[in-house]
From Swiss-Prot:
This is RNA pyrophosphohydrolase. Accelerates the degradation of transcripts by removing pyrophosphate from the 5'-end of triphosphorylated RNA, leading to a more labile monophosphorylated state that can stimulate subsequent ribonuclease cleavage. It comes from the Bacteria. Residues 8-159 form the Nudix hydrolase domain. It holds the Pfam family NUDIX. It comes from Rhodopseudomonas palustris (strain BisA53).
Amino acid sequence: MARYEDLPYRTCVGMMLLNAEGLVFIGRRSGGIEHVDDSHVWQMPQGGVDPGEDTWAAAKRELYEETSVQSVEKLGEISDWLIYDIPRTVAGRAWKGRYRGQRQKWYAVRFTGLDSEIDVTTPGGGHKAEFISWRWEPMQNLPNLIVPFKRPVYERVVKEFSALGFPEPKASVGHR
């Protein structure tokens, strides 16, 4: 087995899904080796980029595979790749011991559909559910809900997208 320091990072994408009120979708993870702390089981959709796949296409695919959501409009992206290491104690078991962490490209999108479109228990494309429940959460709360080793990434995502976490402006009604 390769030394931890020699393992590569898995190339992934993350998606911040904002509703019209400026709240962010978070899903409650169904568990997994990399979740070392049961009190921090909430996260935004994220997943791997397939070989040759564009990161924006991967982000839309992952969002659909984890939430069934397709009704979105792109608001922004973080130009940098954000990186985190998984704890050494689980590195040999997570992702079959092939990676030391993830390098992620993050996107923000506005959800333009109805909440009834969201289905985490039988997500799109027949994929295995990664979440057991979901909710809308204020953006500033996100770093405290994620496992500690991902917290710096979430802090950066919140900082970069903080201006997007406001409600959509309502159309004004003209005066007669």
